[in-house]
């Protein structure tokens, strides 16, 4: 009875709270519309990239195809229509003109608004000038600190005798997370900056770290200066074709818009993230040979974290944490050198390219042999080459990539898109990744996190009907010839599907309901200790309603249910209901938001995920299981014309446990709270 009362109370709050407490960009809602639980880590990287664009938007009247392709909610057809509208009707004088573009709906317009501004239609023709760059530039500095209010086991006081027996029982540093970001920009041509980060538990100017922050990243990035299309010095990323050879960027998950799911990588790009693993360090350039042809050359030499012995690299350490003595022992223990090139042709009806990448370690990569990792990359040097292309044939688009490693093992992806009209797009994607294909920098479309040991067929649909409705869905069939981690059986298969209906009758109101299903093999141990490989089944139903009272004030309510099982064994149910309300007023310095959620899950299998508005560049996505509630308050205060203070306080309360977390992350008690503070200075 008490559970029913709490549920009714939470629903009533969701339905009645209207004018509560940050106006946050509308595009963040796109993530909630199209992503799923398993694409969160990929979305985190794209979130930082899109946040940077929204902070420094594009001039719609001089925007390019390459810039529009950075926005994943725009289809290829809609991008062409935007450019055609500007060509036919001339420069826009108001954002309201966006709805005059064929295929532009209310929801897409809201998302696009955050990335554009109305500026002059003529590009500046004056030559690049160092004097003008030093005078007319934009700079900003962000300083962030996260403060926890609960002591975790890893920060407790232990005796010298205890630490001598267990040296990794205690973190080496303070519990505060800190980062610093500096950015210099001149037009859309020159960027350079610094990113520094200290994770919670890492030492700061103490112990094994005397240099302050644990991670530093410096970059210089130039673009569109004469025939020099791009130049990156320092830390950068590279992504070409469909990512079967090289993709360090954002990988489109299966739940994303079918209209843009088969988009090529964006080549060389600046690296502004705090990711301590997924980047290159050196020099890279893209040069325009002609109006249609360009060539990219890139080189990288960097150290990496790894567990090593005298001869071999046993595991690559990718989490970036250096909080324990065991972490310090793995820090910068190996180096990797990489060289690559890409030749690309961009025509009116055809695009294609040739990519080749060679990289080597200073030691032999040889992970401890397990049945499932028999075909993982092994060796000291690796070479991959590939050919990719895209052909536009009226309402059809054919695309694909073929890649090979130095032993001749193949990876292939093919796609066919059909758009009978501006409102409908159907896409079919087939993939074949040999179980022995090896590429350290590949990140292709599929179910596996590795681009190997997978065959699959995907079909996706996106269509609008009855003016205000949008239907999205997909089915993906996949097959794994070899064993996988936690799957001790060959020749397993599975099915992944999603169906979503959205309703957006006006600029102010959007709602959608989404159903997701996944059936995937996984190891399972019966109570009798018998070990089997059984289908792991997950159902997810999510409903959400967004209502914007104006540009500054918005209410979001949502409800979600989860059901999981292992082929009629160990059934687990979970749900959440909650709201987010945002407020602000034009010209008023204070803006904010509040999020409240009630959740109840049987165990970890039916865990739920929650996105919260946070400080700039901080991706706030959390997972919860058990029974409890979550409250978060976010405030944005403009101190002066050039200084903004952001703060986020969060509190989680559990009803069915006396401790939170485990190991060094364990907190005694039922409550957990923390505070994020960030100061932004721009000039």
Protein language model features and the residues they cover:
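Bacterial Sec-dependent N-terminal signal peptides
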Residues: 1-27, 683
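N-terminal, intrinsically disordered low-complexity tails/presequences enriched in Lys/Ser/Pro
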Residues: 22-58, 121-136
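Extended, structured, electrostatic nucleic-acid-contact surfaces
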Residues: 51-72, 88, 93-100, 115-116
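Small-residue hinge/turn detector
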Residues: 75-79, 105-106
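Transmembrane beta-strand segments of Gram-negative outer membrane beta-barrel proteins
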Residues: 129-166, 184, 188-194, 231, ...
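Exposed, low-structure sequence patches enriched in small/polar residues
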Residues: 171-175, 278-280, 334-367, 373-683
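Outer-membrane beta-barrel proteins
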Residues: 197-215, 269-276, 329-332, 403-405, ...
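Outer membrane beta-barrel
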Residues: 210-268, 272-305, 420-439, 589-604
């Amino acid at each position: 009875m008490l559970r029913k009362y709490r549920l009714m109370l939470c629903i009533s709050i969701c339905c009645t709270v209207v004018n509560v407490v940050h106006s946050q960009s509308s595009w963040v809602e796109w993530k909630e519309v199209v992503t799923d639980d398993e694409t969160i880590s990929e979305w985190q990287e794209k979130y930082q990239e899109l946040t940077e664009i929204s902070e420094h938007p594009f001039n719609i009247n001089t925007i390019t195809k390459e810039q529009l392709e950075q926005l994943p909610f725009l289809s290829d057809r809609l991008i062409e229509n935007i450019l055609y509208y500007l060509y036919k009707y001339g420069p826009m004088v108001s954002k309201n003109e966006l709805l005059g573009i064929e295929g532009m709906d209310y929801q897409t317009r809201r998302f696009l608004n955050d990335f554009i501004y109305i500026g002059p239609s003529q590009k500046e023709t004056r030559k690049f000038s160092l004097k003008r760059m030093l005078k007319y530039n934009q700079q900003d500095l962000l300083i962030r600190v996260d403060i926890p209010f609960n002591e975790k086991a890893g920060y407790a006081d232990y005796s010298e005798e205890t630490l001598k027996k267990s040296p990794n029982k205690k973190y080496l540093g303070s519990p505060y997370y800190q980062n610093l970001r500096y950015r210099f920009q001149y037009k859309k041509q020159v960027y350079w900056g610094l990113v520094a980060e200290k994770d919670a538990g890492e030492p700061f100017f103490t112990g094994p770290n005397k240099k302050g922050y644990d991670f530093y990243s410096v970059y210089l990035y130039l673009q569109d200066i004469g025939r020099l299309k791009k130049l990156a010095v320092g830390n950068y990323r590279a992504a070409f074709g469909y990512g079967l050879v090289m993709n360090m960027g954002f990988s489109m998950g299966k739940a994303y818009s079918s209209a843009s799911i088969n988009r090529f990588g964006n080549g060389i790009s600046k690296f502004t993230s705090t990711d301590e693993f997924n980047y290159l360090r050196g020099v890279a350039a893209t040069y325009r040979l002609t109006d249609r042809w360009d060539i990219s050359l890139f080189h990288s030499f960097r150290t990496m974290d790894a567990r090593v012995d005298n001869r071999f690299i046993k595991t690559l350490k990718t989490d970036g944490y250096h909080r324990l003595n065991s972490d310090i022992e793995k820090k910068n223990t190996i180096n990797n050198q990489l060289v690559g090139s890409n030749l690309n042709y961009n025509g009116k009806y055809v695009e294609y390219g040739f990519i080749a990448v060679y990289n080597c370690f200073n030691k032999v990569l040889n992970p401890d042999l397990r049945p499932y990792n028999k075909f993982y990359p092994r060796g000291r040097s690796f070479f991959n080459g590939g050919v990719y292309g895209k052909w536009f044939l009226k309402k059809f688009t054919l695309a694909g990539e073929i890649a090979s490693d130095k032993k001749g093992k193949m990876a292939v992806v093919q796609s066919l898109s059909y758009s009978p009209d501006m409102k409908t797009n159907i896409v079919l994607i087939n993939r074949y990744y040999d179980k022995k294909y090896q590429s350290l920098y590949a990140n292709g479309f599929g179910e596996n996190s590795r681009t190997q040991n997978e065959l699959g067929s995907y079909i996706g649909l996106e269509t609008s009907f009855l003016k205000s409705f949008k239907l999205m869905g997909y089915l993906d069939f996949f097959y794994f010839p070899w064993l996988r981690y936690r799957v001790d059986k060959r020749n397993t298969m599975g099915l992944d599907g999603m169906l979503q209906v959205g309703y957006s009758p006006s600029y102010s109101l959007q709602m959608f309901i989404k159903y997701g299903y996944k059936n995937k093999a996984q190891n399972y141990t019966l109570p009798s200790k018998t070990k089997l490989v059984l289908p792991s089944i997950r159902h997810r139903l999510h409903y959400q309603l967004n209502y914007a009272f104006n540009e500054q004030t918005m209410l979001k309510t949502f409800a979600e249910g989860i059901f999981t099982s292992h082929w009629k064994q160990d059934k687990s149910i979970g749900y959440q209901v909650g709201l987010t309300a945002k407020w602000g007023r034009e010209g008023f310095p204070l803006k904010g938001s509040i999020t409240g959620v009630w959740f109840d899950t049987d165990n970890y299998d039916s865990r739920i995920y929650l996105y919260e508005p946070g400080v700039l560049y901080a991706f706030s996505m959390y997972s919860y299981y058990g029974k409890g509630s979550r409250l978060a308050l976010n405030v944005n205060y403009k101190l002066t014309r050039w200084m903004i203070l952001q703060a986020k306080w969060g509190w989680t309360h559990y009803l069915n446990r006396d401790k939170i977390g485990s190991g060094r992350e364990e907190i005694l008690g039922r409550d957990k709270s923390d505070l994020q503070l960030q100061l932004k200075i721009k000039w």
